[in-house]
């Protein structure tokens, strides 16, 4: 579904296209540019693209809620790169720094340390907490303004966030750090919704954007309870689910409060009889044909995540 009711954001932007992608556009073999700059902007301005046109979409998991999505023509988007808290309020969550990967668009859902390390990747453009509509080539991003979940779900943090930070975390008077913008990325004929740490029941005005998305990325266990996830899935009826925001051995520390989602994944298979795909790598390629007829299929990266 193409969203036409949100006001467009008019921007001239930069992106990265691989040499293979530019070859698809021109029909000729074009080697990748040795320079990391906006050279490919000229190409995409000339060729454009259609986000609804079917094609292969690559999804790479960089841990936590960070996913690199590559469109059929090579536009790249990275969601929610992570870092450790610099204020001293929270302990060290991550063993390493986020890798300095090259990407066209860096996108964040909200201003928390585990989602907003937008300066770590070598991004040609940064869209922080996008609200509205943005289009580039064969990617269209729709940002939906809502609110962060204002009380952590057990066993995330035994502490109360409002008391720790001495700020108001719940609407309507929450600080900006507890705003959240759900991001819907449309490309290759697929609509992929990145939930961020949004509350379990968004503003009803957002429902028609979220219903029947193809892929829904949800922060299972640590942010949302299983009952909340079940309610979201029933309400929006996605073709596929990807759990995020969970404990990864080799990435997260024991004091992070992040939890395993193995139990939730097992329940999806045994209790809900979902088609669970346990992946053996940190990347996944999807297309509309692959998901046709699917309902609540689970793609689980397990402990596989990209490290560079």
Residues covered by each model-derived region:
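Positively charged n-region of N-terminal signal peptides that target proteins for export
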Residues: 1-5
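Bacterial N-terminal signal peptides
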Residues: 7-17
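Sec/Tat signal peptide C-region and signal peptidase I cleavage site
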Residues: 19-23
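Cysteine-centric segments in proteins
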Residues: 24-32
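Pre-active-site segment of Zn-dependent metallo-hydrolases
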Residues: 38-56, 60-107, 111, 115-126, ...
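Beta-strand-turn-beta hairpins that frame and shape the catalytic cleft
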Residues: 51-57, 71-76, 135-141, 184-192, ...
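Active-site-proximal loop/helix segments of hydrolase catalytic cores
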Residues: 165-236, 244-249, 253
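Binuclear metal-ion centers of metallo-dependent hydrolases, dominated by the metallo-beta-lactamase
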Residues: 177, 240-308
């Amino acid at each position: 579904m193409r969203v036409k009711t949100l006001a467009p954001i008019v921007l001239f932007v930069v992106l990265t296209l691989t040499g293979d992608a530019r070859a698809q556009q021109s029909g000729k073999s074009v080697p990748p540019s040795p320079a990391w700059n906006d050279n490919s902007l000229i190409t995409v301005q000339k060729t454009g693209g259609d986000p609804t046109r079917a094609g292969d979409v690559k999804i790479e998991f960089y841990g936590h809620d960070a996913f690199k999505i590559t469109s059929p023509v090579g536009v790249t988007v990275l969601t929610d790169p992570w870092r450790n808290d610099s204020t001293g309020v929270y302990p060290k969550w991550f063993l390493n720094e986020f890798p300095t990967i090259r990407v066209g668009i860096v996108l964040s859902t909200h201003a928390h340390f585990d989602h907003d390390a937008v300066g770590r990747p070598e991004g040609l453009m940064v869209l922080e907490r996008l609200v509205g509509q943005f289009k580039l080539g064969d990617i269209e991003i729709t940002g939906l303004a809502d609110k962060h979940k204002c009380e952590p779900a057990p066993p995330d943090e035994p502490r109360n966030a409002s008391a720790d930070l001495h700020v108001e975390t719940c609407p309507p008077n929450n600080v900006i750090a507890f705003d959240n913008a759900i991001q819907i990325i449309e490309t290759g004929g697929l609509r992929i919704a990145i939930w961020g740490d949004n509350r379990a029941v968004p503003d009803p005005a957002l429902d028609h954007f979220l219903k029947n998305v193809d892929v829904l990325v949800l922060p299972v266990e640590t942010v949302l309870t299983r009952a909340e996830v079940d309610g979201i899935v029933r309400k929006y009826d996605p073709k596929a689910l990807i759990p995020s925001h969970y404990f990864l051995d080799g990435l997260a520390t024991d004091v992070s409060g992040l939890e395993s989602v193995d139990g939730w994944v097992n329940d999806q298979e045994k209790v809900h009889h979902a088609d669970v795909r346990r992946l053996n790598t940190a990347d996944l390629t999807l297309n509309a044909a692959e998901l046709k007829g699917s309902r609540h299929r689970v793609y689980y990266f397990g402990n596989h995540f990209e490290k560079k």
